[in-house]
Amino acid sequence: MFMSSSSSSHARRPQLSSFSYLHPPLPFPGLSFSSTRDKRVNFDSTRIISIAKSKPARTTPEYSDVLQTGLPLIVEDDIQEQEEPLEVSLENQIRQGVDIVKSMLGSIEDGEISISAYDTAWVALVENIHHPGSPQFPSTLQWIANNQLPDSSWGDPDMFLTHDRLINTLACVIALKKWNIHPRKCKRGLSFVKENISKLAKEDEEHMLIGFEIAFPSLLEMAKKLGIEIPDDCPAMQDIYTKKDLKLTRIPRDIMHNVPTTLLYSLEGLPSLDWEKLVKLQCQDGSFLFSPSSTACALMHTKDGNCFSYLNNLVHKFNGGVPNVYPVDLFEHIWSVDRLLRLGISRFFRPEIKECLEYVHRYWTKDGICWARNSNVQDIDDTSMGFRLLRLHGYEVSPDVFKQFKKGNEFVCVVGQSDQAITGIYNLYRASQLMFPKETILHGAKEFAGNFLRKKRTANELLDKWIITKDLPGEVGFALDVPWYACLPRVETRLYIEQYGGQDDVWIGKTLYRMPYVNNNVYLELAKLDYNNCQSLHRIEWDNIQKWYEEYNVGGFGVSKRGLLKTYFVATASIFEPERSVERLAWAKTAILVETIRSYFGNSREERIAFPNEFQKAKTRGYINGRRLDGKQATKGLIEMVFATLNHLSQDALVVHGQDITPHLYQSWEKWVLTWQEGGDRGEGEAELLVQTINLMAGHTHSQEEELLYERLFKLTNTVCHQLGHYHHLNKDKQPQQVQDNGGYNNSNPESISKLQIESDMRELVQLVLNSSDGMDSNIKQTFLTVTKSFYYTAFTHPGTVNYHIAKVLFERVV
């Protein structure tokens, strides 16, 4: 993403992971600050937040069912032992964390973002229109004076990046020198610049700030005019001057004065501009592509009233400082939702997420979006992320938004730019995986992005120019190695919790900046608490399902403990929520019963015929009373196991939903048994049985008018899962073929035709499930996709990887 984005409303918002150069915070009760100057929040790593007693308890009926549905939150003994007498319970910690995040999401404005000393200095340079010789915005100079760091520099206090510290510091020195104030601070800052300028050569080029090669040399020229001499003959500076000359020769002057481009973001570094023409390219808010420094430069040259209004509003909003870009409303809305989804805690915030996506959809255009609303310039990063989230949540969005970014067989991050950003192409890849049938531009995007990312990974070049994050190679690697069709929610969350850097992730613009509503430790700590709580419940369920396995001697019918574990893992990694325990266990037990019957009787046609006959007899007589059945001992044992399990599931559903689903369960099983009897093929009808069982256990029903769509979903799901099951059976004793990063297959392989058909059918299924215009409950449709993705995972994931995922998801606590 070229820049970034956020949201709007005018209530003061609670602050999270904040800094001295952030908009002054209104802290949450319970957040402790290290000093009055440094506003960074200190988080207690053992819990989320303790709400101060002065804050009234908040009722949250909208998510109470998520926290309590007769299934208690699990508190490990070791956690209990460490708790202090006044420490709140795990349930309350989660509830308080949820309340805090709800408060954040409910108070989003135009973007919570850190202050940029560089941009603040540019605004400080503006001369008062009515009183020449004095600053137009004196509070910016006060901010500069108050925020010099102990090492005499200005910039991000928690990450030392030479580019960032130098450009911030030199800009502040120039501002102080221009108005002849704070000479000691100015001298100290100048010494820092001279001592550190040679370090530029040692930093990763990918982490060079946006437009640094234009902006920094321009600052050096301004410094010379003020009598500030800075040696610029070091090799690093010579390289920067070379890049500047090259970039300036590539700038299409005729275009930039007539058509909105990203160059509007960096006008302060460009010489010989026609301001009369450029003023016509202002954004609606008076800014030049939402850049305070660019707009300040424009104000100096034009005295434009709209530029003044934009800057004046920012200076007042942020108490003297200004960010490097503003607003960032779309960026904040989109990325906050993405983080909550990937951290596995989105279920707590469904209304807030819906509100965020409604906001994004309101400002969506046929050409995509950028980081802020009402922009005439778009970027592929925000467009890709917005497209993906909107489509996932049932909004109708056209892939034609990507046409303007297509350049031959490649895609560019911003129209007119040739260099690529890893995260921009990564998010394009993620978006392209949600393609519907006949969306050729997404097919091309997926192929290009997959190849691009794979080459970068091979070359160990997964550094990004837009963000410095904890584990970008891990994020990209997971996307390449686990196709979205095979991505199980709990696997993604377990790994992403380790990849997400919380408040330590830093964004790269003209300066380093922070987005505390996107990257913060509150999300992270809540995700950890919730994950471990869910995992504790899963461990209890695993113990109970092993008892069920032993009670009915499932092992005696040929199903191993290993098979039991894998089956329970797949169900749990797909449906993990504590409140969905009955659905999860029904899935696991149903799948085990199917595998038991299929493996034990599959090789004997006689027994395959006998079992359905006995099943019919038992169903007709009714097994409620546990009557002993005629027939062979094995058949009798299996029949008893099936009906005892079905009756137990029915009782669970009756308790949870007040509905007797016994006849429907029997009917679904009868259909599967007859299908199996006729063919006995791998996976034949199993997906339908699982989907029907899960939806019944969840209390989901569909109307008569939706029957045709329901049957179409069943047919497509059965077809795909049957093909996947057949493929898995053929390849279970050899290494599964890895789906290529471009989403395709090697067509020289004789099995490729069927795999391509699977991909085609998957696209159709995804379209049916994500299409909201048909009126069917999305939860019902989502079950079809969830089950199908589990089959895809099983078919195409290497056994060693499955073992790793099982260990991580079920048995390794998050710390």
Curated annotation (Swiss-Prot):
An annotated GO cellular component: chloroplast
GO molecular function: isomerase activity; magnesium ion binding; terpene synthase activity
Residues annotated as binding Mg(2+): D379, D381
Cofactor: Mg(2+)
Pfam families reported in the protein's UniProt record: Terpene_synth, Terpene_synth_C
Gene Ontology biological process terms from the UniProt entry: diterpenoid biosynthetic process; gibberellin biosynthetic process
Motif residue range(s): DXDD motif: 379-382
Main localisation: plastid
Gene3D superfamilies: 1.50.10.160, Farnesyl Diphosphate Synthase, Terpene synthase, N-terminal domain
Keywords: Chloroplast, Isomerase, Magnesium, Metal-binding, Plastid, Transit peptide
UniProt EC number: 5.5.1.28
Activity regulation behaviour: Inhibited by high concentrations of magnesium.
Chain segment of the transit peptide: 1-50
Substrates-to-products reaction catalysed: (2E,6E,10E)-geranylgeranyl diphosphate = (-)-kolavenyl diphosphate
Tagged with keyword Methyltransferase: no
Enzyme type, top EC level: isomerase
Family affiliation: Belongs to the terpene synthase family. Tpsc subfamily.
UniProt function note: Diterpene synthase that catalyzes the formation of (-)-kolavenyl diphosphate from geranylgeranyl diphosphate (GGPP).
Entry's free-text remark on domains: The Asp-Xaa-Asp-Asp (DXDD) motif is important for the catalytic activity through binding to Mg(2+).
Protein name listed in UniProt: (-)-kolavenyl diphosphate synthase TPS10, chloroplastic
